[in-house]
Every structure is written in structure tokens, then in C-alpha cells.
């Protein structure tokens, strides 16, 4: 499971001219699901994101998490995070999970964030969406559950 996490002052997602999800300060999370992802990937990523300290404290240091700030999350499913551009000029998305697998895992991810007490808004799975955001910082982090399981390199 792969997430592009953007710290925002506000973000919204629109489908067919209607705003379907919007937040104030918090995180916009673009979420992609891989063919091999499981509930373990959901739990790992949700826990890491909820506790990730990427908000500044009074001294300007990254010491606060989404939980600490009381911010919200806007979760938008995005299969294109698994684009393979190694061959040709048109990306392949064969690594992305099929919708019948991905949709329940995205729903479970949003539920997992809510269990931490985080207010969560969402896009519409599989819809053509327009995402608007004001990136704060900017702070943008890419996180992948497969990489989180790898051992850290020794210095």
C-alpha cells in the first residue's frame, strides 16, 4: 500500500461538480493499493500516518502528529500510484489491485484512521475526481508499506 501524504491547510475533492469531501488543516492522503496488500498493510500504514510527526511545534520543529494537532484527513484512492513507466510511453498499472480488492482495503484504511479519533473525509472510489489543496510547508511524504517492513540501513 502506497500513500502520498501532503500536509495541508485545506483540501477538497469534487466529483461531477459536487464537493464530496473537504477538510481544514490536516493531511491529504492519496492512497494506492497493490495486488499483494492485506489488512496488515492497512494497519501498518494507518498507524504510521496517524502518529507521523510532521506538524511543527511552537519552536518550529516537526514534533506533532495529526493526533496531536486534532487535524483531519482527506483520503483519496489513486491507483496511478502504482504506475510502471519502465517500458514505452504509456504507464502500466498491472501492479495496482483490482477494484474489488482495492475498494474494501481503502474503506478499511479510512476506518482505521477513524479508530484513532481522526476525522476523515473521502473521495469516491473509482470516480473521476478533482482534488484541490493548499499544501502547507510544503510538506509531502511518500510512504509504502512494503518499504516500512524493510530493515533500516546501518550507518
Curated annotation (Swiss-Prot):
Biological-process GO terms, alphabetical: D-amino acid catabolic process
Catalytic activity: glycyl-tRNA(Ala) + H2O = tRNA(Ala) + glycine + H(+); a D-aminoacyl-tRNA + H2O = a tRNA + a D-alpha-amino acid + H(+)
A GO molecular-function annotation: Ser(Gly)-tRNA(Ala) hydrolase activity
Catalytic EC class: hydrolase
Subcellular location: Cytoplasm
Main localization category: cytoplasm
UniProt xrefs under SUPFAM superfamilies: DTD-like
Segment forming the signal sequence: none
Chain span(s) of sequence motif Gly-cisPro motif, important for rejection of L-amino acids: 137-138
EC number: 3.1.1.96
Pfam families: Tyr_Deacylase
Domain of life: Bacteria
Gene3D superfamilies named among the record's database cross-references: D-tyrosyl-tRNA(Tyr) deacylase
Keywords for this protein: Cytoplasm, Hydrolase, RNA-binding, tRNA-binding
Family annotation (InterPro entries): Daa-tRNA_deacyls_DTD (IPR003732), DTD-like_sf (IPR023509)
A GO CC term attached to the entry: cytoplasm
Coiled coil location: none
Classification via HAMAP family: Deacylase_Dtd
Similarity comment: Belongs to the DTD family.
PANTHER family per record: D-AMINOACYL-TRNA DEACYLASE 1, D-TYROSYL-TRNA TYR DEACYLASE
Domain notes: A Gly-cisPro motif from one monomer fits into the active site of the other monomer to allow specific chiral rejection of L-amino acids.
Subunit composition and interactions: Homodimer.
Role summary: An aminoacyl-tRNA editing enzyme that deacylates mischarged D-aminoacyl-tRNAs. Also deacylates mischarged glycyl-tRNA(Ala), protecting cells against glycine mischarging by AlaRS. Acts via tRNA-based rather than protein-based catalysis; rejects L-amino acids rather than detecting D-amino acids in the active site. By recycling D-aminoacyl-tRNA to D-amino acids and free tRNA molecules, this enzyme counteracts the toxicity associated with the formation of D-aminoacyl-tRNA entities in vivo and helps enforce protein L-homochirality.
Protein known as: D-aminoacyl-tRNA deacylase
Organism: Chloroflexus aggregans (strain MD-66 / DSM 9485)
Amino acid at each position: 500500500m502506497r500513500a502520498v501524504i501532503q500536509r495541508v491547510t485545506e483540501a477538497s475533492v469534487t466529483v461531477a461538480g459536487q464537493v464530496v469531501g473537504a477538510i481544514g488543516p490536516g493531511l491529504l492522503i492519496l492512497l494506492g493499493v497493490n495486488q499483494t496488500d492485506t489488512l496488515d498493510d492497512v494497519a501498518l500504514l494507518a498507524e504510521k500516518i496517524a502518529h507521523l510527526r510532521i506538524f511543527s511545534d511552537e519552536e518550529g520543529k516537526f514534533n506533532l502528529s495529526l493526533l496531536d494537532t486534532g487535524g483531519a484527513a482527506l483520503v483519496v484512492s489513486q491507483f496511478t500510484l502504482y504506475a510502471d513507466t519502465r517500458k514505452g510511453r504509456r504507464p502500466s498499472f498491472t501492479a495496482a489491485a483490482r477494484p474489488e480488492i482495492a475498494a474494501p482495503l481503502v474503506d478499511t484504511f479510512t476506518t482505521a484512521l477513524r479508530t484513532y479519533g481522526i476525522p476523515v473525509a473521502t473521495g469516491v472510489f473509482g470516480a473521476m475526481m478533482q482534488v484541490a489543496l493548499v499544501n502547507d510547508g510544503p510538506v509531502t511524504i511518500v510512504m509504502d508499506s512494503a518499504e516500512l517492513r524493510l530493515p533500516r540501513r546501518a550507518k
